[in-house]
A protein has these predicted regions:
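Conserved glycine-rich Rossmann-like NAD(P)H-binding loop of the short-chain dehydrogenase/reductase
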Residues: 30-47
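Catalytic loop of short-chain dehydrogenase/reductase
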Residues: 142-166, 170-179, 189-192
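Short C-terminal tail/terminal secondary-structure segment
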Residues: 151, 237-238, 249-264
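Conserved glycine-rich cofactor-binding loop
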Residues: 9, 14-18, 40
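A conserved structural motif in NAD(P)-dependent oxidoreductases
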Residues: 207-212, 221-233
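Substrate-binding pocket helix/loop in short-chain dehydrogenase/reductase
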Residues: 102-103, 110-115, 218-219
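Short, small/polar-rich loop/turn modules that mediate ligand/substrate recognition or access, typified
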Residues: 92, 178-182, 248-250
Length: 264
């Protein structure tokens, strides 16, 4: 399916690896120009090089190093995008997860840091990007959150609680920014990202598993009996960003292979 986004401009955060990278990958394969972001300059440069090998047509990749919890870095990220391309069509927000832990093991600083990372980064970007997105022909926002907003996950009180605000924001944006801008969220379960691979490798080194395949199998928790491929989520993000999903708005879409037990 041609998503009809060739030549569009997409800004993707936390996109030097993981699900943010997979989203940028899917977009650039469709011919969209992408601006990627990350805190580590070396990882960002590697991601840029990888994406450029997959870019369709005349699509360009621009890398902007920065911390999404720093308002000045976010301003520079958006300004660079507009300076480079003169437009913005799609915003894809992603962020690393807050630390795991039980409620009584957290303090005020943990909650404030999680809110800055997961919520305020999206708030600031959406505020900064709303006007250029509306100026185009069908702007979109896709927020990558977690299926923990549907079902609380043991030991992840910060993610379970704070990410709910992101979904509430996304729904509100879908109402307030329409009809010029659509806003949706994707709620991933486990995907075989570099972080998961790292955790499995560490478990093998501790002697918990004999092989990578054995360790990865412990992350499988769905009827499809396999962990997700990051590009499967990336393809969904690209679809939601495209006019092919032109009547999909204000939705929070779980991408977990059917692993959740929630009816809604």
């Amino acid at each position: 399916m041609d998503l009809d986004i060739e030549g569009n401009v997409a800004l993707t955060t936390a996109s030097s690896s993981g699900l943010g990278f997979a989203s940028a990958q899917a977009l650039v394969r469709e011919g969209a120009n992408v601006v990627i972001n990350g805190r580590d300059g070396d990882s960002l440069a590697d991601a840029k090089a990888d994406l450029e090998t997959e870019a369709a047509g005349d699509a360009r990749v621009v890398a902007v190093e920065g911390d999404i919890t720093d308002p000045d870095d976010l301003d520079r990220l958006v300004e660079t995008t507009l300076d480079e391309f003169g437009r913005l069509d799609h915003l894809v927000t992603s962020a690393g997860g807050p630390p795991s832990g039980a409620f009584l093991d957290t303090d005020d600083e943990d909650w404030e840091a999680a809110y800055e990372l997961l919520v305020m980064s999206v708030v600031r970007l959406a505020r900064k990007c709303a006007e250029p997105l509306a100026d185009g022909d069908g702007g979109t926002i896709v927020t990558i959150t977690s299926r923990s907003v549907k079902e609380a996950i043991d030991g992840l009180v910060l993610s379970n609680s704070v990410r709910m605000s992101v979904v509430g924001l996304e729904k509100t944006l879908s109402m307030e920014l329409g009809p010029d801008v659509r806003a949706n969220a994707v709620l991933p379960g486990s995907h075989e990202t570099s972080r998961i691979r790292e955790l499995v490798d560490q478990a093998i080194e501790r002697g918990e598993y004999d092989s990578y395949e054995e360790g990865l199998a412990d992350w499988v928790d769905n009827p499809l009996d396999r962990i997700g491929d990051p590009i499967e989520l990336g393809n969904t993000v690209a679809f939601l960003s495209s006019p092919r999903a032109g009547h999909v708005n204000g939705q929070a879409i779980v991408i977990d292979g059917g692993g959740g037990s929630s009816n809604l």
